[in-house]
Amino acid sequence: MGTRFLLALFLVLLVLGFEVQGAQLPQQDEPSSPTLLTQMQESLSSYWDSAKEAARGLYEKTYLPTVDEKLRDMYSKSTAAVSTYAGIFTDQLLTLLKGD
C-alpha cells in the first residue's frame, strides 16, 4: 500500500470517528443570557461594520474616475505580468524536477 493511500484512509477514518463522537452528544439548549464570547463577537462585528461604513463613505467622497481607471489598468497589467512570470517559473521548475 502506498503512503498516499494510507494517509487518505487515515484522514477518512479520523473524520468518521469525529462524526460518530459528535453524534453521541445530546443537543443542549442555548443559554438564555449571551456568553462573554458572544458579546465580544457582536462588539467586534459592530466595530467592523462601522469601520467599513466609514471607509465606504470616505471612498465615495474622494472618488475620482480617472484615478480609478488608472488603478484598474495598472492592476490588469501587473496581474498579466505576474501570471506570465509565474507560468515561466512553473515551467522551469517542472523541467528542473523532471529532468530531460
From Swiss-Prot:
An annotated GO cellular component? chylomicron
UniProt-listed InterPro entries: Apo-CII, ApoC-II_dom_sf
Q: Which UniProt keywords apply?
A: Chylomicron, Glycoprotein, HDL, LDL, Lipid degradation, Lipid metabolism, Lipid transport, Secreted, Sialic acid, Signal, Transport, VLDL
Where can this protein be found? Secreted
Post-translational events: Proapolipoprotein C-II is synthesized as a sialic acid containing glycoprotein which is subsequently desialylated prior to its proteolytic processing.
Region (Lipoprotein lipase cofactor) location: 78-100
The name this protein goes by in its record:
Apolipoprotein C-II
Source organism per UniProt: Otolemur garnettii (Small-eared galago)
Q: Which gene encodes it?
A: APOC2
